[in-house]
From Swiss-Prot:
Residues 687-711 are annotated as: Activation loop. Residues 1-30, 99-120, 248-318 are annotated as: Disordered. Belongs to the PI3/PI4-kinase family. Type III PI4K subfamily. Inhibited by wortmannin. Increased kinase activity upon interaction with NCS1/FREQ. The modification Phosphoserine is found at S258, S266, S275, S277, S284, S294, S428, S511. Residues 278-297, 306-318 have a biased composition (Polar residues). Coiled coil: none annotated. Residues 2-68 are annotated as: Interaction with ACBD3. It is a peripheral membrane protein. This is Phosphatidylinositol 4-kinase beta. It is found in: Endomembrane system; Mitochondrion outer membrane; Rough endoplasmic reticulum membrane; Golgi apparatus. The modification Phosphothreonine is found at T263, T438, T517, T519.
């Protein structure tokens, strides 16, 4: 949020090297480089060092930095601690490459003068090729990450670290887990190359700062505790959590908090004065954190926050800018841990609604939902809409979050709180003149609402402690009130003049609506999420907006998030990256496969947040609620075989099934029961829960031995074994595999970099990466690949282990 793209310097024409044949313009040399992208071993280390040293000399002249060291690495390339230093893209061509006259004495002594001249010529050519690759349009972020990981030369690493400033923020953000994992677990030169970019971006974006702090903590957790405490990752995390990286404009605003005369204060100034006077109480935030800490890791985090907060002047400084958001996240996690201690789903649901009702007392505040893609402030959580999701041992839950979109999170004021009892007046504005209230009176009534939350102190830990209190009856009255307000808003919008509609038109419209309206699920106390997930998203947004005191505001938005405690989402994040990369590859190669990667926020090694898939329910819920086969459910939802709606849903099913079958094969995704496969309103299937991938399986049983899950019910929806859509499915599988193996390196490097220093179960065993590469079948012809696809499809359909695992899940967890 609030990311600012670093504008690269305009590209200058690059002088072509003269080492290629006449008239070739060096094209053959460039083709040689592009054929071996990532194979850094073919480049002489001394040549790479010399080439990059020349570029870095130019950087030194541009930035006025410290001279380049003898190893080729800059001692101070980009001053990450400087706020106003200009960051420029290093696309300018370097100076003419110097001959290595001073360094060649030993080489000449060991060989003939002719051999030395030939070696110098070859080195110059290799130097030119490498630099031309780095400056070409082919050099994208994926290639930069590959060279940063594979290179052993500090000069190359430092050059690429500076090239990170040239790429779009969103492109680099995709590889943030890889960058931070390299920073933590690889040598110092890699860390020195990465840090300036991380520090610069943290100054620009509070959301980027939060992401870095969370990932650094999660990926450092696999280290030994004594090593972890003094590691570079821990030090960088402490720097981010302190106030050192606060944007300059926020630091300059602090003197404005000095006391002002009481006379003639405007309402806004009076509010500001109040927040300053309460700053002393709010600054003690860190000392109260330990009341809600539930494990030693959280306590350690709190100690770090406390130490950084004590140095702040209580009179003039607000708390660390990330402190309110961290408290908001910790309170959501604490709710999940408390829910897990309750025995029944109904008790968990009641407790969840009560806890969220108390949480609303501290909103609006300077907090946001990190899974969203735009700047906003959280203003309200409609607590009666929250549901507990299916889980045997834990208590993941789904909440909906009302936010107000803003241009810049850091500079926009926190919205004023609107009490719940003002819903009627805000939603029935057009009726107010009839009640004798003028427009001026109405405007005046809203302007007198004090903005008590327009500061960083809006989130107080003292009130979070109150969440320990159970209020089982809170949700009942709130639900009734919201229902009443919804009715009032509907009646208030009724037209004043009668409208006459023919009875035949009414019957026709009702019949059309019934034909296209999806069926609703019945409320099940053991599965309360089914009804909530089945409701169409747009209908849910309309309903919640009508019941919200903020719903009348034009920048009101509704978000949703799944909160998970006790689960390590680092594997989920890895799977998300692979799915996102495959999705990009198939789009680039124009293969109409469909998959739905959903965002993952890793909070710690055992907690996180997940972006829900809207308008989708699990196949288990479909079968349990409808008591129909998958094909019959399709017919019920989308119409008969020949309708356009059914044919469109069938095509969507085939394209998504083929896409996820390839994903499951390449990543070896396990635990594929019907509770982990969703079906959306358009007919797509979406696989969720990637907790068992690559080298791991549930309880290490190795139950699922087939390449992917393809049941007879899936084939029936496709039209049977002899249907055209089933042949289309196999053709898509072949096209998708051919396209994926063309870009194998982009997929493999995502996984390979994350294996560094990791103790995740998916990396157990020494052959994880080798087996992943083998599943791309680089040596096979297309005819052999076609035969392979036929064999995998046939084997998956006939797999006895798939049937056994589905039966096992039904007996142990009741999953149909």
């Amino acid at each position: 949020m609030g990311d600012t793209v670093v504008e690269p310097a305009p590209l200058k024409p690059t002088s072509e090297p003269t080492s290629g044949p006449p008239g070739n313009n060096g094209g053959s040399l460039l083709s040689v480089i592009t054929e071996g992208v990532g194979e850094l071993s073919v480049i002489d280390p001394e040549v790479a060092q010399k080439a990059c040293q020349d570029v870095l000399e130019k950087v030194k002249l541009l930035h006025g930095g410290v001279a380049v060291s003898s190893r080729g690495a800059p001692l101070e390339l980009v001053n990450g601690d400087g706020v106003d230093s200009e960051i420029r893209c290093l696309d300018d061509p370097p100076a003419q490459i110097r001959e290595e006259e001073d360094e060649m004495g030993a080489s000449v002594a060991s060989g003939t003068a002719k051999g030395a001249r030939r070696r110098r010529q070859n080195n110059s050519a290799k130097q030119s090729w490498l630099l031309r690759l780095f400056e070409s349009k082919l050099f994208d972020i994926s290639m930069a990450i590959s060279y940063l990981y594979n290179s052993k030369e500090p000069g190359v690493q430092a050059y690429i670290g500076n090239r990170l400033f040239c790429f779009r923020n969103e492109d680099v953000d995709f590889y943030l887990p890889q960058l931070l994992n390299m920073y933590i677990h690889m040598d110092e030169d890699v860390g020195d190359a990465i840090k300036p970019y991380i520090v610069y971006r943290c100054r620009q974006s509070i959301n980027f700062s939060l992401q870095c702090a969370l990932l650094l903590g999660a990926y450092s957790s696999d280290m030994h505790i004594s090593t972890q405490r003094h590691s570079r990752g821990t030090k960088l995390r402490k720097l981010i959590l302190s106030d050192e990286l606060k944007p300059a404009h926020r630091k300059r605003e602090l003197p404005s908090l000095s006391p002002a005369p009481d006379t003639g204060l405007s309402p806004s100034k009076r509010t500001h004065q109040r927040s300053k006077s309460d700053a002393t109480a709010s600054i003690s935030l860190s000392s109260n954190l330990k009341r809600t800490a539930s494990n030693p890791k959280v306590e350690n985090e709190d100690e770090e926050l406390s130490s950084s907060t004590e140095s702040i002047d209580n009179s003039f400084s607000s708390p660390v800018r990330l402190a309110p958001e961290r408290e908001f996240i910790k309170s959501l996690m604490a709710i999940g841990k408390r829910l897990a201690t309750l025995p029944t789903k109904e008790q968990k649901t009641q407790r969840l609604i009560s806890e969220l009702s108390l949480l609303n007392h501290k909103l609006p505040a300077r907090v946001w939902l990190p899974t969203a893609g735009f700047d906003h402030h959280v203003v309200r959580v409609p607590h009666t809409q929250a549901v507990v999701l299916n889980s045997k041992d834990k208590a993941p839950y789904l909440i909906y979050v009302e936010v107000l979109e803003c241009e810049n999170f850091d500079t926009t004021s926190v919205p004023a709180r609107i009490p719940e009892n003002r819903i009627r007046s805000t939603r029935s504005v057009e009726n107010l003149p009839e009640c004798g209230i003028t427009h001026e009176q109405r405007a005046g009534s809203f302007s007198t609402v004090p903005n008590y939350d327009n500061d960083d102190e809006a989130w107080s830990v003292d009130d979070i402690g109150e969440l320990q209190v159970e209020l089982p009856e809170v949700h009942t009255n709130s639900c009734d009130n919201i229902s009443q307000f919804s009715v009032d808003s509907i009646t208030s919008q009724e037209s004043k003049e009668p409208v006459f509609i023919a009875a035949g038109d009414i019957r026709r419209r009702l019949s059309e609506q019934l034909a296209h309206t999806p069926t609703a699920f019945k409320r099940d106390p053991e599965d309360p999420s089914a009804v909530a997930l089945k409701e169409p998203w747009q209908e849910k947004v309309r309903r919640i907006r009508e019941g919200s005191p903020y719903g009348h505001l034009p920048n009101w938005r509704l978000l949703s998030v799944i909160v998970k405690c006790g689960d390590d989402l680092r594997q989920e994040l890895l799977a998300f990256q692979v799915l996102k990369q495959l999705q990009s590859i198939w789009e680039q190669e124009r293969v109409p496969l469909w998959i739905k990667p959903y965002k993952i926020l890793v909070i710690s090694a055992d907690s996180g947040m997940i972006e829900p898939v809207v308008n989708a329910v699990s196949i288990h819920q479909v079968k349990k609620q409808s008591q129909l086969s998958l094909l019959d459910y399709f017919l019920q939802e989308h119409g008969s075989y020949t309708t356009e709606a059914f044919l469109s849903a069938q095509r969507n099913f085939v394209q998504s099934c083929a896409g996820y079958c390839l994903v499951c094969y390449l990543l070896q995704v396990k635990d594929r029961h019907n509770g982990n496969i969703l079906l959306d309103a358009e007919g797509h299937i979406i696989h969720i829960d990637f907790g068992f991938i690559l080298s791991s399986s549930p309880r290490n049983l190795g139950f699922e031995t087939s390449a992917f899950k393809l049941t007879t019910e899936f084939v029936d929806v496709m039209g049977g074994l002899d249907g055209d859509m089933f042949n289309y499915y196999k053709m898509l599988m072949l096209q998708g595999l051919i396209a994926a193996r063309k870009h194998m390196d982009k997929v493999v490097q995502i996984v390979e970099i994350m294996q560094q220093g990791s103790q995740l179960p998916c990396f157990h065993g020494s052959s994880t990466i080798r087996n992943l590469k083998e599943r791309f079948h680089m040596s096979m012809t297309e005819e052999q690949l076609q035969l392979l696809v036929e064999q995998m499809v046939d084997g998956s359909m006939r797999s006895i282990t798939t049937k056994l695992y589905d039966g096992f899940q039904y007996l142990t967890n009741g999953i149909m």
